Amino acid sequence: MPLSTSLLGKKNTYKDSYDATLLFKIPRINNRNVLGIDSNHLPFYGVDIWNTYEISCLNKNGKPLVGIGTFYIPADSENIVESKSFKLYLNSFNNFIIESIEELERIILQDLSNVTYAKVTGRIFPINTKIEFGIPSGKNIDNLDIVCNNYGPPDNSLIEYEDVLVEEEIYSNLFKSNCLVTGQPDWGTIVIKYKGKKLKYDSFLRYLISFRNFNEFAEQCAERIFIDIKNSINLDFLSIYIVYTRRGGIDICPYRSTDKSYTLPNDKRLIRQ
């Protein structure tokens, strides 16, 4: 279905009964074709991590159950899920009577797997679960004194490197893009790990800032950055992790890596989550 038929950016009525058909799928192939990515031979591995903070249903006695969900959608899934549709879908459980949170978890995982055409994993945690906060372990490049005048579209010519080999992690809290459909701001922290020729921090920060007024879905921004870096520098290893802040009770954190046996970033939340 075309994106224009989705519920994103439209006034919607919340349904009071569970409805899996609310989930709206978006084929990944469309944006990947634009980026020159062969969907049959992806240049990366990874996952989209969805953290959902507004999950509730009713138990057999009519008492509300609540939880926080984390779901992992493989980067090689055929489709992504449009976030507004996922929010409406989750809220359709609000008056749904169910045996337990575990049963709700099973239903959500199955529905997400059905719509993405991939095996989605994850779980729903109790609200009283202790969550640790932290900061990325790498070098923050935000304090560089740079002049910026390009806020979109992204300018990959700004990705420059020095003739020195490094293995490092850098990050920025200044990343921002906009929703492809509504234009609403998506704020995030981006973490880059790589091994190869050293990125020039000042020009690379300007590159990241050139996404500021650019309209693109979160997952697609991560893949664009991955491809732009990969095409600019011959690296032995590269991973991209964007931790977006929540909107509508959901935050989306795409992770892409050249390493097939990648290890997911630690589960510490950032302060803006």
From Swiss-Prot:
The chemistry this enzyme catalyses reads: 7-aminomethyl-7-carbaguanine + 2 NADP(+) = 7-cyano-7-deazaguanine + 2 NADPH + 3 H(+)
Q: Which UniProt keywords apply?
A: Cytoplasm, NADP, Oxidoreductase, Queuosine biosynthesis
Its Gene Ontology molecular function terms?
A: preQ1 synthase activity
Q: Where does substrate bind?
A: 81-83, 218-219
Enzyme kind, highest EC tier:
oxidoreductase
Catalytic residue positions: 179, 186
> In which pathway does this enzyme or protein participate?
tRNA modification; tRNA-queuosine biosynthesis
Q: Biological process GO annotation list? A: queuosine biosynthetic process; tRNA modification
Where in or outside the cell it occurs: the entry states: Cytoplasm
HAMAP family the UniProt entry points to: QueF_type2
Q: How does it assemble?
A: Homodimer.
- Report the protein name in the record: NADPH-dependent 7-cyano-7-deazaguanine reductase
